[in-house]
Amino acid sequence: MSAFGEIADDYRAKGKSEAAAVPDFPNFRLGLNVASADQRVIILISGNEKEIKEARKSISAVSNDPEIIGRFHYDFETDPKTWTGILTGNKSKSGIKIIVPDTYGQKGKIVESLPLETKAEKLKTALLKANETFVKTTEKKNYQNHVQEGRRKGIKWTMPMEFGEDRDGDGKIDRRAGRRR
């Protein structure tokens, strides 16, 4: 056994991986942007609070399946205004939407919409099929060229929090190390 294996044995998981929480973005626009940057399909689970609570439980087993884990991003939304304006396709208010982001993560296309009560096997099959199609039809991005092209086209992404660090403790982001204001 390797040294890493011996160390890992001391830190075994306490619960079942199928019950692990499903990662969720703070808002759909950020999720769509990150999915585009990571070149992944994003799964939008939408509905009212009660529906979302139930969906989190059922989606967990699928999202943590060995064939699925790490291949998708997820977002849970109760307010349809956060996503209806930037998506094309079936915009039913509640359901599981499999979405392909555009090149710059500004918009997305709903490629399949399923009811929230979809059985795990059917959902898993739909996800794997969507991912297979996405991988075959999406050109790999070169980060530097992608950012350059986006800037030329005037596409900008503003994060809710400024980039940088407050090194001098004045409450403002220091733009460049070593430069005085």
Spans of features found by a protein language model:
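Proteins that catalyze or organize thiol-disulfide redox chemistry
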Residues: 1-181
